[in-house]
Structures are given as structure tokens and as C-alpha cells.
């Protein structure tokens, strides 16, 4: 091995960990910036598409972030609560994307509260929009009902849905 190759190897061994560490810091900073925009409640109400786009960017920037369920959940809530895209039936793709995002939260979150909230909103989308989009992925009604009632974060919406759709409880009994 010649001296230039040896020097290059030493330089790589010394510098690469610093470069990798710096890039991870950059990723974390970018994630926090996009997460801040995504979770801004006044922006959600005034410019829901912009807030949802920021949620997508947070997911894109750092898909392995331990808190990745947060942008998926907020992205879904923004679509359901602050846009009329699902009501107008503008796009089956938006419904499917929202449903899949809520499913990711349910499947991947460690938080019982987040699972409960995501389940109640998935139940909501399935019940409210089933005529427009049919059933999307089999029947998650009963498991969503159970999870929705399991924690205070999803309980209120789930109870409202049970009162509105009286057969729901019978269907899952």
C-alpha cells in the first residue's frame, strides 16, 4: 500500500464518522422544522394542504424517526377535519392514503392513546365514507371500535359514532 492510499484511508476513518453524525443532525433539524409546520394548529385550519405537505416532508426526511407516527396521524386528521376532499369525493386515492396512514399509526405506534385516536378516526372514515368508497380493506370495524373505546384520546369520537350508528355495537357483539 502506498503512502497516498494509506493517508486517504486514515482521512476517511477520521472524517466519515463526523460527516455521518453531521448529516444525522441535519436530518433531525429538518424533521423538526417540518414537524413544527405540520403540527401548527392555526396553519392546519387556514392552509390544510400546506400543513399536510409539511407532514409528508417530515415523513420523507426521516422515515425512521421514533416519533414517525405523529406526522402520519396529523396528516390524516388534517385531511379528515380541515379539508373537504373526502366529502366531495374528489379522490379515492386520498381516502386510501388516509386509511393507510391511520393503519400505519395503529400498527407502529407504541402509544395506546395514539392507537385509540387513529382507530376512532379510521372507524369514522369507514362509516362516513363507506358509500362513496365501499369498504377499503375488509372489516376493521370491531377492532377499531374496541381500540377507540380503550383510551380517552379516541373514546369521545368512538362513543359519538356508536350513538350515531346504533347497529355498530350489535355488529361487533
Walk through the language-model features, giving the residues of each:
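Short coil/turn linker motifs that delimit alpha-helical repeat modules in TPR/alpha-solenoid proteins
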Residues: 26, 44-47, 64-66, 94, ...
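Terminal, low-structured helical/coil segments at or just beyond the last alpha-helical repeat
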Residues: 136-173
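Short solvent-exposed coil/turn linkers within tandem alpha-helical repeat scaffolds
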Residues: 61-68, 105-118, 150-162
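Helix-turn-helix repeat elements of alpha-solenoid scaffolds
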Residues: 42-56, 90-103, 137-140
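Alpha-helical junction/boundary sensor with strong preference for TPR arrays
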Residues: 41, 55, 61-62, 102, ...
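Amphipathic alpha-helical repeat scaffolds of TPR domains
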Residues: 25-40, 65-86, 112-132, 163-166
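Classical Sec-dependent N-terminal signal peptides that target proteins to the secretory pathway
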Residues: 1-23
